[in-house]
Amino acid sequence: MRLPGWLWLSSAVLAACRAVEEHNLTEGLEDASAQAACPARLEGSGRCEGSQCPFQLTLPTLTIQLPRQLGSMEEVLKEVRTLKEAVDSLKKSCQDCKLQADDHRDPGGNGGNGAETAEDSRVQELESQVNKLSSELKNAKDQIQGLQGRLETLHLVNMNNIENYVDNKVANLTVVVNSLDGKCSKCPSQEHMQSQPVQHLIYKDCSDHYVLGRRSSGAYRVTPDHRNSSFEVYCDMETMGGGWTVLQARLDGSTNFTREWKDYKAGFGNLEREFWLGNDKIHLLTKSKEMILRIDLEDFNGLTLYALYDQFYVANEFLKYRLHIGNYNGTAGDALRFSRHYNHDLRFFTTPDRDNDRYPSGNCGLYYSSGWWFDSCLSANLNGKYYHQKYKGVRNGIFWGTWPGINQAQPGGYKSSFKQAKMMIRPKNFKP
């Protein structure tokens, strides 16, 4: 049943009065006049037209406490409006894209544009050709890479073969040149013979002193090449028949072997104790005659072993004092030709300030604190630091990789050291 308009308004006024009363009670108002009469008034505001009459409802000021959650309603409404605008924009963009696609697909709605159809066909044909060319280009690149790999392999093989061939030829020529040089040095020039009819003997190495009757080990002067100055060497006249020219000696650690290129070139130390004779002098000695090399080693347990090589030659400084050794014999093991990657034969001389080794990531001479014919890096190094006992850390001491038990040390553990080491040479044809 529908209530008449005036009855509905009366109900609204009554509800408003009750709300005001509750508000006054809540605020603690005790004014009798406020409790006696309802401040809400309903009264006519004009003439009636039929069953419809205008009314005016007057309400006092009313404060209602709203929940806190309604405070963020305005922000939420703003976000909703923003999202609605974004959605409307996307819808419009999609509609535009669809219209453009329809225009390109069927302009004018009749599908009769033959020019654009032909153009599309040409574009597809060009794309097909581009894809085909790209595939062929990729195949060509793969083939080029394969050929480059084969070429590098062949290049390395050829370079190794050429290097071995050249080394063999150089070794043979060295023997011949040394032989001829030895013969020529014994034949004085005619001018020299006329000026000095009585000749003094030239001692090219310690074996010449031995042949002439000297049997005491010590320092002697030699002239391996009459075109260069004479110099002193230490001669071992006792070991294995005598006549040995000592190139290097380690006895007590009194000489520092962590030296630069210039020091190893000229030589250093004390001939009576520890020394390196000098690469220039070693070159002259090994150039004048075909030499053999003997290495004597002794550890701190009293074990003494030796290594003998039937050929020994050191090139000049221009060739970086390259080492040439022959076949091995002895008891200490062939540490100079330990393996493929640790082979000191045919290697250049390296010092901490001159990197000529085969190690790609650093300087072996700098890492092992010495000058030597390093490979990548070492299986032998007689110029390492002198340790008076076993040591830890980098294996930078005197080292001979084939010594009994020397490689049994655990990584980071103690490493063996040597009490004595000596390198000496003698002519291959020497007979005590």
Curated annotation (Swiss-Prot):
Main location: secreted
Entry annotated with the keyword Glycoprotein: yes
One matching Pfam family: Fibrinogen_C
Superkingdom assignment: Eukaryota
SUPFAM superfamilies per record: Fibrinogen C-terminal domain-like (SSF56496)
Keyword vocabulary terms for this entry: Coiled coil, Cytolysis, Disulfide bond, Glycoprotein, Secreted, Signal
Location of the protein in the cell: Secreted
Record-annotated membrane-spanning stretches: none
InterPro entries from the UniProt entry: FIB_ANG-like (IPR037579), Fibrinogen-like_C (IPR036056), Fibrinogen_a/b/g_C_1 (IPR014716), Fibrinogen_a/b/g_C_dom (IPR002181), Fibrinogen_CS (IPR020837)
Coiled-coil intervals: 71-157
Any one Gene Ontology cellular component term annotated for this protein: extracellular region
Induction info: In macrophages, during infection by mouse hepatitis virus strain 3 (MHV-3).
Keyword Metal-binding: no
Glycosylation site list: N24, N172, N228, N256, N329
Cysteine-cysteine disulfides: C206-C235, C364-C377
Residue ranges constituting the Fibrinogen C-terminal domain according to the UniProt record: 197-429
Region (Disordered): 100-122
Signal peptide residue numbers: 1-19
An annotated GO BP: negative regulation of memory T cell differentiation
Tissue: Constitutively expressed in cytotoxic T-cells.
General function of this protein: Converts prothrombin to thrombin.
Subunit structure, as described in the record: Homotetramer; disulfide-linked.
Protein name: Fibroleukin
Origin species: Mus musculus
Phylogenetic lineage: Eukaryota, Metazoa, Chordata, Craniata, Vertebrata
Gene designation: Fgl2
